Amino acid sequence: MSREALIERQTTETNIRLKVALDGSGTWQGSSGIPFFDHLLAQMARHGLLDLKVWAEGDLEVDNHHTVEDIGICLGQAVKKALGDKKGISRYGSALVPMDEALVLVALDFSGRPYLAWGLELPPGRIGSLETELVEEFLRAMVNNSGLTLHVRQLAGHNAHHLAEALFKALGRAIRQAVTLDPREQGIPSTKGILS
């Protein structure tokens, strides 16, 4: 069973082609046009053992918002499509990741009910050319389009780069845990018999 998906999205603001393989080796290819955002996506892919390819063109001359948000939309849709009916998945995942002074906790559930509980205090400003406020926008778009319940908590830290990187590493590890197929689970991991 191949658990991968390709999503294409074209608007007047962006043109995005995104491919994800859930049972990958952690490879990243492509470009969003925003180097630090690419770095974060590469960290998520590597630590999630996801193969992620992103080709994006956006109206970066306006700002980065449309591109970052639309990549979140595409990633959410791709993960949802790749999971199919979610039969046999572990469903839940969590990770606690340090990076120097920063410590970030991510807990998630592929419940089919989108919800983002945001508990990260990224200082206003930019990391490279990425506005820190767009990290939350990316996650909200991903959550809303994947049906994911996601909790993010900052337990320590103040450096925006370290916090963002710890977050994306933790997100990758939690996704990896949640999408892993459990050989003992023959059906949908829910007493309802459905995750939607």
Swiss-Prot record:
Any idea what this protein is called? Answer: Imidazoleglycerol-phosphate dehydratase
Q: Name one GO cellular component term.
A: cytoplasm
Give the molecular function GO annotations.
imidazoleglycerol-phosphate dehydratase activity
- Disulphide bonds annotated for this chain are none
EC number(s) stated in the UniProt entry for this protein: 4.2.1.19
- Protein family per UniProt: Belongs to the imidazoleglycerol-phosphate dehydratase family.
The pathway is: Amino-acid biosynthesis; L-histidine biosynthesis; L-histidine from 5-phospho-alpha-D-ribose 1-diphosphate: step 6/9
Output the superkingdom of the source species. Answer: Bacteria
| Cited Pfam families | IGPD (PF00475)
Catalytic reactions on record: D-erythro-1-(imidazol-4-yl)glycerol 3-phosphate = 3-(imidazol-4-yl)-2-oxopropyl phosphate + H2O
| Gene Ontology terms: biological process | L-histidine biosynthetic process
Compartments, as annotated in UniProt: Cytoplasm
Q: Which NCBIfam families match?
A: PRK00951.2-1, PRK00951.2-4
Cite the PROSITE patterns for this sequence. IGP_DEHYDRATASE_1, IGP_DEHYDRATASE_2
Query: Can you name the source organism?
Result: Moorella thermoacetica (strain ATCC 39073 / JCM 9320)
Q: InterPro entries annotated for this entry? A: IGPD_sf, ImidazoleglycerolP_deHydtase, ImidazoleglycerP_deHydtase_CS, Ribosomal_Su5_D2-typ_SF
Q: Which CDD domains match?
A: IGPD
Q: Which keywords does this Swiss-Prot/TrEMBL entry list? A: Amino-acid biosynthesis, Cytoplasm, Histidine biosynthesis, Lyase
